[in-house]
């Protein structure tokens, strides 16, 4: 009896510390769970901030590329201006001298001076008509006035802008032709093509040899200018017509290769599989799932981001 009483006391003493330890561990686990939830919320917020920063980086990179291009162009123009600055100054001096001369010419090209000059020429050269001389002098006066206006516009502008405009004119892209050739694609459904019989339509390529054509070009290089201009105008106004025959519903063939004349377009449409809304959604989700990892790898390579590998869980030691 005494032995049994002693064993029961020992078991009661062992249960008390175990329950206290369990309570402590439960409290610790609850605190850890709270901390984990707070950290997960902070991680989500940081991910959103990272996405915003990535978008800002993209925009900043585009702005940097544009600024670098502008800086290169400006540096080139400044170098050219430094090299040719004395020549530009001499040009402006000559422009001012020409303007002073034009003022003198305008005074001399007045109506009284023109009439006196016409009368003197009429007396010296009796064969010439006075009207023709007057028109010639009047045209010359108009040329001087237009040239004077151009010089005033050059004098008001800065040398840098004048030089940039000159550079654009010299090194600019080649001017496009006023009347480019057109390519007209015609279908069998077009009424104009349906009127043309099939015998008249030529689908064969030109049989002329390329080497002969190149020799003819070399021989005709030294022809007259007027003939060249007429050929260029013909080439500009000519249109390239391309006839594209399309299959009708009567010419649709079976799998065996036999033509079915009685088949209708409705039967052909029914043979094709129909896609439901669920199938479209499933395919779109699949495409997105395939595209997401490739985007992640691209962002890592562009911005040198660390790889998002899953953390390895270390095995806990057994008590």
Swiss-Prot record:
Changing residue 300 to A: Loss of function. Changing residue 296 to A: Loss of function. GO terms for biological process: cell division; homologous chromosome segregation; meiotic centromeric cohesion protection in anaphase I; meiotic sister chromatid segregation; mitotic sister chromatid biorientation; spindle attachment to meiosis I kinetochore. Residues 33-62 form a coiled coil. InterPro entries: Shugoshin_C, Shugoshin_N. Transmembrane segments: none annotated. One of its GO terms (cellular component) is chromosome, centromeric region. Disulfide bonds: none annotated. Keywords: Cell cycle, Cell division, Centromere, Chromosome, Chromosome partition, Coiled coil, Meiosis, Nucleus, Ubl conjugation. Changing residue 299 to A: Loss of function. It is found in: Nucleus; Chromosome, Centromere. GO terms for molecular function: chromatin-protein adaptor activity. Plays a central role in chromosome cohesion during meiosis by preventing premature dissociation of cohesin complex from centromeres after prophase, when most of cohesin complex dissociates from chromosomes arms. May act by protecting centromeric rec8 from separase degradation during anaphase I. Belongs to the shugoshin family. 'Shugoshin' means 'guardian spirit' in Japanese. This is Shugoshin-1. The gene is sgo1.
